[in-house]
A protein has these predicted regions:
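Cross-family detector of peptidyl-prolyl cis-trans isomerase
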Residues: 2-146
């Protein structure tokens, strides 16, 4: 093998390692229990398990060293301009959402600080949420259909 071929093979191997790797290790700290912090109280009936709801949300990795506990942003329905619609309490979303959104009213905004066990756990999610990551979400409840 020529020197150029060896260098090409080494570069290709390094590129493959980077491309196949997951997110960097999580170092943001742990949330012990699900935290529900009402930022803005809504009006009307409260959301309950089984309701179809529409929400806007933004999600960040939890960062214990940040004043607002928000680390790297990984997703936002607002950025896409499209709310998420799902049936609450049926396991269609992470458990931290199913448990944390119950009781919200239309127009309400709530911050959820979610421990890894109620989020994506030891597996993480794709290349954006590392294994064992605690999460922070700001959720706005747009609509409830009983």
């Amino acid at each position: 093998m020529t020197h150029g071929s060896l260098r090409f093979a080494a570069s290709l191997s390094a590129l493959l390692l980077v491309a196949c790797s997951g997110p960097p290790p999580y170092t943001g700290g742990d949330v012990a229990d699900l935290q529900r912090i009402d930022v803005q109280t809504g009006t009307g009936e409260a959301a309950t398990a089984g309701d179809e709801i529409s929400v806007h949300y933004t999600g960040w990795l939890y960062d214990q060293n940040s004043p607002d506990k928000r680390g790297q942003k990984f997703d936002s329905s607002r950025d896409r301009g499209e709310p998420l619609v799902f049936r609450l309490g049926t396991g269609r979303v992470i458990r931290g959402w199913d448990d944390g959104i119950v009781g919200m009213q239309r127009g309400g905004k709530r911050e959820l600080q979610i421990p890894a066990g109620l989020g994506y756990g030891a597996r993480g999610a794709g290349k954006v949420i590392p294994p064992g990551a605690s999460l922070v979400f700001e959720v706005e409840l747009l609509d409830i259909r009983k």
